Amino acid sequence: MQRAGGGSAPGGNGGGGGGGPGTAFSIDSLIGPPPPRSGHLLYTGYPMFMPYRPLVLPQALAPAPLPAGLPPLAPLASFAGRLTNTFCAGLGQAVPSMVALTTALPSFAEPPDAFYGPQELAAAAAAAAATAARNNPEPGGRRPEGGLEADELLPAREKVAEPPPPPPPHFSETFPSLPAEGKVYSSDEEKLEASAGDPAGSEQEEEGSGGDSEDDGFLDSSAGGPGALLGPKPKLKGSLGTGAEEGAPVTAGVTAPGGKSRRRRTAFTSEQLLELEKEFHCKKYLSLTERSQIAHALKLSEVQVKIWFQNRRAKWKRIKAGNVSSRSGEPVRNPKIVVPIPVHVNRFAVRSQHQQMEQGARP
């Protein structure tokens, strides 16, 4: 027999291997009856790259290799010729060999497209699947084991219909790369979303940390020099807290817990700062009840009020010790007190409030 002959074995060889002696069995006997069903069930009977070998047992395939001088188009011509003259003589006797053939089919491992063209492959597979479904229930029952699902086989049919590249590399190039491209796109999308969402968070973090360091350096140089960091702990807190007092508001409404090395700043509003300054003019140290009253009135936590007063006292001591230009030894009533003003607040209105407060505070 010739394996290149396209889906047929000579009658004695193939039939003797599969069914009874003298049974002629070929693809033609399968194609003869009613036209094959097309549609989604085209390849359901067989595995992906195994379905279109000559339908005989592997023992019958062994003796005859491909003839050396045969051009590659000869199998197509012979197979097309064999498709035209169909005969149905040995169909009933060939059914037992059909069972053996469907069991033997998955053992073929070579891709079929070296032998047959895509249209012949599709026609042969359709005929074999339709005939096996009609005439023999056992191959139909065995079909899900050796075959792939219709959803997996439909892409294979589309890919087989593209002649230039052989299916196995082409299949592995296109279809596995489709989910990979989807993943790449989704990860890029996630990266874009993260980069679109991160600037807010990263800016806040950078603003929080960088703003602390910048404010600290600025305040230390402006109020007492870098020696303020070398002093005891209250002065360190004072340098940090005056950053919240003088610097730009970093994060609004975040409680600044005490005792943390790097904590979030509390951005006080100008009204809160004015009230705190008033209280500090009256009293440098607060009792617990006063602190709770002030915190409740200003809608702050007691910890925020306590830390603000600690920082304000440290700043006041720094100014008292280092600022020689303070008038009459009372730096508290100095009109050069710096109060942080948010950007959205009118600075002139706040300055006029400051002047009114200063005038009202003086006797």
Curated annotation (Swiss-Prot):
Taxonomy, superkingdom: Eukaryota
Compositional bias of kind Low complexity: 128-139, 219-239
Matches recorded under CDD domains: homeodomain (cd00086)
Keywords: DNA-binding, Homeobox, Nucleus, Transcription, Transcription regulation
Cell compartment(s), UniProt: Nucleus
Pfam families, per the entry: Homeodomain
Any one GO CC term of the record: nucleus
Keyword field contains Cytoplasm: no
Primary location recorded for the protein, binned into one broad class: nucleus
Keyword Transcription regulation: yes
GO molecular function, one term: RNA polymerase II transcription regulatory region sequence-specific DNA binding
Compositionally biased residues, Gly residues: 1-22
DNA-binding positions: 261-320
Biased composition (Acidic residues): 203-218
GO process terms (BP): adult walking behavior; neuron fate commitment; proprioception; regulation of nervous system development; regulation of transcription by RNA polymerase II; sensory neuron axon guidance; spinal cord motor neuron differentiation
Segments of this protein annotated with the region Disordered: 1-31, 128-265
Annotated PANTHER family: HOMEOBOX PROTEIN GBX, HOMEOBOX PROTEIN GBX-1
Protein name: Homeobox protein GBX-1
Source organism: Homo sapiens (Human)
Protein encoded by which gene: GBX1
